[in-house]
Amino acid sequence: MPTFVDRVVLHATAGDGGHGCASIHREKFKPLGGPDGGDGGRGGDVRLVVDPSVTTLLDFHFHPHQRASRGRPGQGSNRHGADGADLVLPVPDGTVVLTEDGEQIIDLVGPGSAFVLARGGRGGRGNAALASARRKAPGFAELGEPGEQLDAVLELKTVADVALVGFPSAGKSSLVSVLSAAKPKIADYPFTTLVPNLGVAQAGDRPPYTVADVPGLIPGASEGRGLGLEFLRHIERCSVIVHVLDCATLEPGRDPMTDLDVIEAELAAYSADLSDRPRLVVLNKIDVPDAAELAELVAPELRARDLAVFAVSTATRRGVHALSLALADLVAQHRAAAPARAATRIVLRPRAVNEPDFTVRPLGDGFLITGSKPERWVRQTDFTNDEAIGFLADRLARLGVEKELARLGATAGAEVTIGEVTFDWEPTLSGGGLGNGGLGVDDHPGGDGLAETGPGGRGPAGTAASGAAPSPGRGGDTGSSVSLGPRGTDDRLRASVRLTRAERMARRAAAVVDPAVRGEPAGRGEEEG
């Protein structure tokens, strides 16, 4: 079972928004209580937060699917649903978030830095929020918007001050163990170290610094040979690079200078940014016979390259203290020159400047409508409710969708796709008639431009349908005007019907008691915008 994981694929799902509620207030002696359906709660976000106590992505290796809680639905009596709890995922310092194609999204460095990986869906508005002067008691509510889903690649680039690089069995793990209190696995065979080992070193009264032992590099590591490609990224953030050269190994074609040139070539091939990092050279294992003489032989040539050289024995700890002091000074210089990083909370939701509300383009024999507003409106519409469909049609008409379809030559019956929903378009005779009626009320047969609308266009029973016979008026009483016939036509029939106050109250009461609005949650929702 792995104990160190530095790359995982995370499947994050934010919480859905809670559904809005369609409810009518019921109280003794209040026959016209009005709508009182509450809004649904917002879904929880999925957030990544840097936690200094976390050093690996192991938890996500075993649990790659993470889901936040959804918002609670609204209820009657204007009770709003509770928001879903955010899902906070602790990640190590230095975690990079990538798309599946390898494009970097964000680089999280610094304790407390946070990133909203998936945003929760908006809660749906209840019918109390949807009421207007023309729509006194809406018989529908909005649906909760689904939470975002994202598959992201998390990569850990260790945040270490000093990186030890070198060939396998050069003594890097042994050097970490004497510089710090870390206890890495040490053995006398190549590739003993399979994961980076981190240690915290303290040199005298200098500030502490971190040391990372990178698994052994071999020629071709930057191209994927050996283990180098998997762990070369852990060198990217280091302040100082330390070449650990083995002075005791006698192999054909290998010597300290050759090893140095090979490792430098691999670092340059991996990233040009590493060329400006300060470097030190450690000539290791000088306690072995003949190793000290070899170290003295190559030291002048290394110094000629402007490299600081330290002859070290991890077995006897000779030269270790001087090396630690030099590393502490270099790290302190780098920290003083680097700008301080502050913990940040990042939410990336870029939007183009002057982005249109919607676009219409041909799609086969039909048309495809894209845009954040129409797509969101479709997601939050309850297509089992005729009144909700009429409300959607009015919103699209006011946005200018019908006029744009007519301009592009759309004919009756053409398929119009918005998001995941496809409609059969039924244009009004004069075009643009959708914007002339009441908000969310379809008082004409088929005149809302959407084939889903039910007979008569009105949703709940008890409301006047197209073609209904006007009630006889009573002279002298204050009345209200009822619009009959297809909306948006040139020969629209308007009949002014004089109704007594008692008759108007009776009609409103009939609409209020309609079975479609019994106070149960009827939809899901979000905020209009």
Swiss-Prot record:
The keyword Cytoplasm applies. The keyword Secreted does not apply. Coiled coil: none annotated. Its cofactor is Mg(2+). Keywords: Cytoplasm, GTP-binding, Hydrolase, Magnesium, Metal-binding, Nucleotide-binding. It is found in: Cytoplasm. It is an enzyme of class 3 (hydrolase). An essential GTPase which binds GTP, GDP and possibly (p)ppGpp with moderate affinity, with high nucleotide exchange rates and a fairly low GTP hydrolysis rate. Plays a role in control of the cell cycle, stress response, ribosome biogenesis and in those bacteria that undergo differentiation, in morphogenesis control. This is GTPase Obg. It comes from Frankia casuarinae (strain DSM 45818 / CECT 9043 / HFP020203 / CcI3). The lineage of its organism: Bacteria, Bacillati, Actinomycetota, Actinomycetes, Frankiales.
